Amino acid sequence: MRPARALIDLQALRHNYQLAREHRGGKALAVIKADAYGHGAVRVAQALEAQADGFAVACIEEALELRAAGIRAPVLLLEGFFEADELALIVEHNFWTVVHSTWQLEAIEQAQLAKPLTVWLKIDTGMHRVGLYPHEYQAAYQRLLVTGKVARIVLMSHFARADELNSGCSDEQFAVFESFRKGLAAEISLKNSPAVLGWPHIPSDWSRPGIMLYGATPFGQAHPLADRLQPVMTLESKIISVRELPAGEAVGYGATFVCDRPLRIGVVAMGYADGYPRHAPTGTPVQIDGQPSRLLGRVSMDMLCVDLTGVPQAGLGSRVELWGKHVLASEVATRAETIPYEIFCNLRRVPRIYSQD
């Protein structure tokens, strides 16, 4: 069997959720969209269901997968519904739905529903993706109330730059939110992972932790709370070939790395088809049999090369950690000029092995 695999530490997941819930985030919906950022949505939901206040996914297909697996906790559709006929399924399965557009509001007004909805009414305070315009917000709230088809409304927005701790954008967005929700009697939800960790003075009845659940920092700098996160995924494989190369020899496609001295090279069963970032450069950290080392040359579809020169005991079958508890996913992502969200979500054919502790 090919040795590439992702080890998922469910106890670390629970620890990270509890950190989100405790740190001024109010109740917390665990965000498990995109297959729980590559960690496996059903297994993550099963691990958290007894602890979590609910879950959030992107769309009804992801929510239905959870219900089919027996998950009965509240599930919020972060992008709401895409077609009006989804409302019947939302009611049938007790999903909560975001409303971010006037057409969705009109669909609710026109729908014949078996029971009332829980709606999270989204205002665009500066992200400028989806959300009602601020001047529409109060009227939309009142329209939902008078339909008689909505049992509960939560007021929500989303911060564009909460991961930038020196930016005033989050405070500016909060000021817009406060101005246009004035007089509306409802709970609020504003905080994603960076807002939970980095903006404690901004209130929120509900938080929506995502990347922090999986143990990756949303910040590009050290942060005391983010430093308490525990990595959930360890991506690992093994050495399948060893080469002794003299100075002047090149490694991999494009000969982008040339040995400046005699080097001992290990070939690892891991490549960009598995989800390891192709653009990770020479020098990206790895760990081999517990010792730090580095990536060499270009990442191939199924293989990559590492430096064994400083790890003389390593050889065929040696364990290689690509990211996890000793090699931070955030550092690998930074070297590859991307973000942890992307490298987690890109994992495709690597089997996941779950542990409870």
Swiss-Prot record:
GO terms for cellular component: cytosol. The modification N6-(pyridoxal phosphate)lysine is found at K33. Its cofactor is pyridoxal 5'-phosphate. SUPFAM superfamilies: Alanine racemase C-terminal domain-like (SSF50621), PLP-binding barrel (SSF51419). Substrate binds at R129, M301. Keywords: Isomerase, Pyridoxal phosphate. One of its GO terms (molecular function) is pyridoxal phosphate binding. It catalyses: L-alanine = D-alanine. The keyword Transit peptide does not apply. Its EC number is 5.1.1.1. The keyword Isomerase applies. GO terms for biological process: D-alanine biosynthetic process. Pathway: Amino-acid biosynthesis; D-alanine biosynthesis; D-alanine from L-alanine: step 1/1. Belongs to the alanine racemase family. Catalyzes the interconversion of L-alanine and D-alanine. May also act on other amino acids. This is Alanine racemase. The lineage of its organism: Bacteria, Pseudomonadati, Pseudomonadota, Gammaproteobacteria, Pseudomonadales.
